[in-house]
Structures are given as structure tokens and as C-alpha cells.
């Protein structure tokens, strides 16, 4: 039987636009902690709290974005969200020394990012054939991973001369190119869900997929160590005395993400959804363990610490790359097609909550030492593995629609 076509023009354009969105995002992820401390004079212990306001904003907008994307044409919601996301980057060029202005801008940026990623994630599912959804999500995620490989390293290279203005200009130009790509995407027509049909206009299940609550809890716990890693690994490497370019960590991590996505999506299409997720968490667990032990290993041997540094990145990347397409498919399979955006919003909400917890508590625990915040991430991932295998798997098999 001939496979349905995956690589349509619109699918390719959405993937490229996603790469440029993620690249602009990852330019700022490892560099903003340095920006807050060196340019705005923020104390190290407060960095996590200031950065987490972005995630809180994303979290607040996700359910509404999912509802709107289910009700109105997704292409229009996608374009408006992309425009707002691009506009936020203009604001960074206007900040000089105001912490309050930074917080307001990050909240606005978070709202735009939450709406854009929720809609884009749903739009790409609409475009790809359902028989190749796992594979399509895997390749789509590779774009994010390529951005992770190049974005942090590029951002850290730009600020090595202390030029934060150039950093923000590069991010702005990148997102404007992505916006141009998004304008050309042709979205398939869908049946618009009437506001007054079947359910009240305002009801909780319009904003959140109740069948996905257990999986959402697991997703939240999985995201905690990921949020800690992306926010504090560069600073952690500096603290333990590693002399290598800390941006290379994200490159190696992205390599693991890419390699795993290239085959895990195909396994998902064959029906191994929960099995793939469990294996991915188990692999990622060893990566976070390596991060936790990095401080102690560096005290004995810098060479051994360098090896552990990159090994942890590879294991983290491979584990999470295995998890992502399977988890996304799990949520979509729990919802009817008319609530696909709501399912994606629930999936991403769990991720955002975990990232926010990681950024916030990671920043607070870093005052005692970064090894403690990575140890916290390790415990959360262990909980996620046990909870998923003992409960979420049974719940999914009972309530799945496809």
C-alpha cells in the first residue's frame, strides 16, 4: 500500500517557520540570565523568578488559544499570533535599565508565544496525513531541535562581546523571516465549531481536555528537569569550572533529539505510543543523573567532567526526543478531531507548568548550589516514570479514541 504524502509545500513551510520561531526563542534562553545580571543588575537568586513570568503568561494563554483555534480558522489565528510574537522582539530593543519594563515585555511575549505554538502545533497536524502523524510530528520537532542546536550557541557567541542589542536584532530579523513563511502556508478547510452548538459557550472542557489530566501531570513532571537544564546549564558549567563552550551542550543535546525523533515517530505510527514514552523517560533519567553528579565529578577531574557533560546532553536529548512525538500523539488520540487544538493546548500546558517550576525553583535552589536544583529535577523525572508506567498507561488504553 502506497504511503500518503507527507512532504507537501505547506508542511515544509510550517516546519521552516517553526525552526525560525524556535531559533529566535533559543537565542534568548541561555543569554537572558546573563543579561539580567550584567545589564539590569538583578541578583542571581531573583533571575529564576523574573524569567518564570514568561512561562506563567504562556500557561495562562494556552487553554484560551486552544479554544479559539478550535472555533475560528486556524490559519488566521496562526498569523495573528505570529505577528504578536514578532512585535515582542521589537520591545527588547527599547529596554535599557528597567526591570519592570522587562517583566511586562516578557509577559506579553509569553502570551504571544503560547498562542503561536499552540496554533502551529495544531495546524501542522491538520496539514499532515493521519496515517503518518507520528512521523510527521517527529520531523516537525526536528526543526525545533535544529534551532536548539544552533540558537543557544549563536546567542552565547553574540553576547561574548557584551553586545545585547545585536542579539535582539538577530532574533527580530529571524522571526520576521519566519512570519513571511507563515503567510504562504495553505491550511486545509475545517468545519468551524459553532459557538452555541452542543456545549455552553463557557465551559471548562472547552479549554482543557479532562481525559488528558493524568498524562498532563506526567508531562509536567517530565518538563521540570528540561526547564532547569535549558535555563541554568550554561551558568552551572561556569560554576563548576568547565572551560569548554557551554553552548556546545545544547548542540549535543539537539543532536540526540534529532536522531531519536527520526525513528521514534515511525514507531508511534505502528502503535507503540506508551512503550516509546516509557523508554524515553528511562534514557533521559540517566542524562539528568549525569547533570546532578557533574559538580562532584568536576572536583576530581575536569576531563571526566567534560565527558560527563556531553554524555548527559546526549542522553537528555535522545530521551526527550523519543518522548515528544509519542506524548503529542497520545493527547491527540484522547480527543475528537473537533477538539484537536484543545488537546494540544492541554499537552503544552503540562509542559509549560513543568518548565515554569523548573525555572522558578531552579533559580531559588541555585542559591545553595546548582547541583541541588538538578537533583530536584532528577526526582521529578523519576516520579514521572513511575506514575506513567503505573497509572497513565492504563488510563490512556481505557479512554483513547483511536
Language-model features, listed with the residues they occupy:
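Helix-to-loop junctions at the C-terminal end of transmembrane segments
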Residues: 62-73, 260-272
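Structural signature of the two symmetry-related core transmembrane helices
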Residues: 76-90, 275-290
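Helix-loop boundary and gating motifs at the non-cytosolic
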Residues: 10-48, 223-236, 240
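Conserved MFS/SLC helix-loop-helix module at the cytosolic interface between two early adjacent transmembrane helices
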Residues: 60-96
